[in-house]
Amino acid sequence: MIRHYKISVPKSTLNNIYKKVRSYPWKMIQNVNGWEYGTNYNFLKKISQYWVSKYNWKKFENKINSFKNYKTNVDGINLHFIKEKSKNPKSRPLLLLHGWPGSVIEFLDIIPKLAHPEKYGGKIEDGFDVIVPSLPGFGFSTPTVSYTHLTLPTILRV
């Protein structure tokens, strides 16, 4: 069964995340300026500070919720996906899959252009029904216990 889904992360969850980021034991990380041993220390500190003090999660929620979000269960896995339907009566589905460590947010700016080209100087007949799933364990899809039974055809049943 496919059901509508609205992304709404409770303020208490966000506050808990911010608290964990603020209290991270930075002294445990070796202060190496380069990227040879992983993420650059200064970059990581800077982006962490940005995330807890300036990033607007609710603005992001509004952006992703401007699309039709859904959840469905496939073989016991709750999969989240975005579906943006074109006004093209002969539209074909276009499946966009993110990789690791990506997510559906990589496609948020291109979804409307693919589904509604007429709004960007194109023709309605060029529009696709765009489907963008959050792969299992990413975004708002639940992780699997084992990936052995999970195949692309299983995900494509969405």
Task: Enumerate the language-model features and the residues they cover.
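Non-catalytic accessory segments flanking enzyme active sites
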Residues: 13-86
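Conserved alpha/beta-hydrolase
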Residues: 118-140
